[in-house]
């Protein structure tokens, strides 16, 4: 679901209040109470020592992106829960003031998305091909847009 409602997806841009986007983006109305979450940002990830030891920590194959998503997914597969705590606020400023995202970061993000997909979901050749085309087609578009002097892209 999060791929459909991701902050930068076409669906979110055309219909911001759709159920997929609302679930992924968690609008202010959705931030009431402690509850389960699919994943939390690595900047806000706190876990029991036992979880890190059993899972082996963050997977080093992921650079900059998806390491937190992967960790939370593996934790869920092992029987643990990821919880959202509204009383905690974490601010992550790295890259926030940059006018444009560097091409290396665009590539790293999309390579990590593909690695994550391959690690956990690769099963069907048709679905794999469509997913690959979607991830790297988007990457190519963002790199071209950036190269042509587009505004900040993600």
Language-model features: locations:
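Residues at alpha-helix boundaries and short interhelical turns
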Residues: 1, 5, 59, 66, ...
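Membrane-proximal basic amphipathic "stem/tether" segments
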Residues: 4-25, 130-154
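Glycine-centered small-residue hotspots that permit tight backbone geometry or close packing
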Residues: 1, 57, 94-97
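Active-site-adjacent helix/loop segment of glycosyltransferases
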Residues: 70-152
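Short, conserved glycine- and acidic-residue-centered signature motifs
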Residues: 64-65, 106
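Acidic/His-rich active-site region of diverse nucleotide-sugar glycosyltransferases
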Residues: 1-55
């Amino acid at each position: 679901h999060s791929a459909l409602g991701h902050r930068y997806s076409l669906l979110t841009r055309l219909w911001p209040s759709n159920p997929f986007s609302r679930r992924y983006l968690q609008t202010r109305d959705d931030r009431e109470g402690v509850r389960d979450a699919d994943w939390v940002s690595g900047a806000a990830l706190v876990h029991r020592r036992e979880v890190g030891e059993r899972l082996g920590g963050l997977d080093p194959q992921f650079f900059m992106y998806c390491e937190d998503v992967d960790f939370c997914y593996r934790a869920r597969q092992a029987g643990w829960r990821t919880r959202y705590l509204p009383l905690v606020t974490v601010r992550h400023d790295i890259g926030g003031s940059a006018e444009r995202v560097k091409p290396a970061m665009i590539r790293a993000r999309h390579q990590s998305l593909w690695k994550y997909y391959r690690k956990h979901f690769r099963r069907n050749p048709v679905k794999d091909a469509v997913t690959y085309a979607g991830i790297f087609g988007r990457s190519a578009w963002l790199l071209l847009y950036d190269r042509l002097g587009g505004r900040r892209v993600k």
